[in-house]
Amino acid sequence: MTTTQVLLDSLLANKASINLATTEQKNQALSAMADQLVAQTEAILAGNAIDMEHAQGKISQVMQDRLLLTEERIEAMADGIRALIGLPDPVGLVLEESTRADGLNICKKSIPFGLVGMIYESRPNVTSDAAALAIKSGNAVILRGGKEAFHSAKAIVTALKSGLEEAGVSPKVIELVQDTSRVSATELMTAKGKIDLLVPRGGAGLIQAVVENATVPVIETGTGICHVYVDKDADLDKALRIVVNAKTSRPSVCNAAEVLLVHEEIASQFLPRLEEALSGQVELRADSQAQALLNQARPAGDQDFDTEFLDYIMAVKVVSSVEEAISHIAQHSTGHSEAIVTENSQTAEHFTLHVDSAAVYVNASTRFTDGGEFGLGCELGISTQKMHARGPMGLREMTTYKYIITGDGHIR
């Protein structure tokens, strides 16, 4: 039996302690987990320093920033856990209830999944976010992070387990897989009958591998080829702020904009202003119409409109209408987040109606697609599928339901 299988069996043996925990018990656990994260900052930073040293020359500067932990980022992780305490318990909610004419009562009630698995890559904060969401929603969780962030994740899980123990909750309801090879990932994907839900979070290759090979239920958190469309009726000052923010505020995350579509009637006014505002910070890869209006853009290649750059790179295209923008998005989007900038309410309504993505914005940056920004607390990921969960996966999406039928000697 492998170490991963041993962890799974241990989680199965202990999951009832969190599946059946009261709201008070779960909130006490979260509070202690957050406190221990801060208390063990030194150990977490030491683990992160090892990961950062290993990352030198192997991943981009943008991805290194994604990996980096600081005291401030650890405090933010703790704050994310504390934010969950104030949110309603998603377990035990009466979703639907009816009583038949013969007196038989049928109640649909929310319950935890049981044991949730998470496969992710190089962002250390995902470790604490996933664990905290699992605890609040009453789930045990097995975490399998990438090798790039292993020492960071190990230190974080140690702190979280200390918090659970301090609060009187079994620390054996959170486990980190020590093996970061493909073997352990495959073991989780095929742990049918043990893992109730598996969520992959990372690049397109990881997500595709899980979706194609898993025999356990999966929620796909898709890559983010996010678009911003600047309409002919846009306020160009507003558009400039939105595009710059959507691309540059944190380019390594999935809600950053990767493609800019600009209406031909305002392209000559807007694109030179955008290029100036970006000050050479972003490499623009433009179609022929856009390139003619820009000084330093390079020609867009065949794959540029289908690439999640996660870097200071943006594909740019000039379109003749909102319909062409919608058509382009339908062809190239991953269904994550899209935005329109326009002062025309009819055009905005047309865009939101016809763009089929998890989050569609009017006059706002795509960077808001986030559990915290949506008032959901931290998130497990951004689901781009349509069944069960779509958009930021918060507490409610970490539950399923069962029917409780109460009678008085009823027979059929």
From Swiss-Prot:
Top-level class of the enzyme under EC nomenclature: oxidoreductase
CDD domains attached to this UniProt entry: ALDH_F18-19_ProA-GPR
Protein EC: 1.2.1.41
Function: Catalyzes the NADPH-dependent reduction of L-glutamate 5-phosphate into L-glutamate 5-semialdehyde and phosphate. The product spontaneously undergoes cyclization to form 1-pyrroline-5-carboxylate.
Top-level taxon in the UniProt lineage: Bacteria
Transmembrane intervals: none
Organism field: Streptococcus suis (strain 05ZYH33)
Cell location: Cytoplasm
Similarity remark: Belongs to the gamma-glutamyl phosphate reductase family.
GO cellular component, one term: cytoplasm
Name of the featured protein: Gamma-glutamyl phosphate reductase
PROSITE patterns in UniProt: PROA (PS01223)
PANTHER family assigned to the protein according to its UniProt record, in alphabetical order: DELTA-1-PYRROLINE-5-CARBOXYLATE SYNTHASE, GLUTAMATE SEMIALDEHYDE DEHYDROGENASE
Reactions listed under catalytic activity: L-glutamate 5-semialdehyde + phosphate + NADP(+) = L-glutamyl 5-phosphate + NADPH + H(+)
